[in-house]
Amino acid sequence: VLVRPPAKVAMVDVRKNKLLLIQSLLLDLIGFSLIFPLVPHLLEYYLNAAANTPMDSWLPPAADYVRGLLPEDRRSSAELIVLIGGILASIYSFLQFSVAPFWGRLSDRIGRRPVLIMTSCGLAASYLLWFFSTSFTMFLLSRVLGGAMAGNMGVVSASMADMTEPKDRTRAMGMLGATFGIGFILGPVIGGLSSLANL
């Protein structure tokens, strides 16, 4: 029986772990950006359905308040939807920015893997909540949960740095950067195609 030398076993494990990190990051970025082309239609649907959705009874007054913030010549439904979409994106990004230090400190204390598992499960739950949401309130909660659980991007970078030799670190970080680019290309394309297919 051939036994693989320990050094080769370790090298294979590191490569496998790096590939898993990249795959995890790619899936998260696709899930994050998939919604971009869908937001206008989603918001239009939720705004029109709010009157018949008890959970969204607060939405029409809130939409009227937001509409009042716009200049008088820019209070059309389309411009209202654009503004609300921007607010939703800001909420997600603000939460992501706010909780990233917490997830980073926690990963230093209990390890990268448990934090990656927690954040990945949280993101998966947010995507499921969004997929099955029947009201704007549920959709908003899914974005809040997603933003709060989006600390895995920093933890993935830290994990990649931990398992990479200093001489290879620039290349490894470049691979993560390329993953960001691929995720932000594939996500909107998949979202746009799914809207055309009425998924």
Write out the residue ranges for each language-model feature.
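Extracellular/periplasmic helix-loop-helix junction of adjacent transmembrane segments
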Residues: 42-96
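Hydrophobic core of transmembrane alpha-helices in multi-pass small-molecule transporters
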Residues: 26, 126, 137-151
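Glycine-rich segments within core transmembrane alpha-helices of 12-TM secondary carriers
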Residues: 173-191, 195
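Residue-level signature of mid-helix packing/kink "hotspots" within the transmembrane helices
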Residues: 89, 93-101, 151, 184-185
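Interfacial helix-cap and linker-helix signal at transmembrane-aqueous boundaries
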Residues: 43-44, 106-107, 190-198
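Conserved MFS/SLC helix-loop-helix module at the cytosolic interface between two early adjacent transmembrane helices
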Residues: 97-134
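Pair of pore-lining "gating" transmembrane helices in MFS-fold secondary transporters
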Residues: 15-61
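Cytoplasmic helix-loop-helix junction between adjacent transmembrane helices
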Residues: 142-180
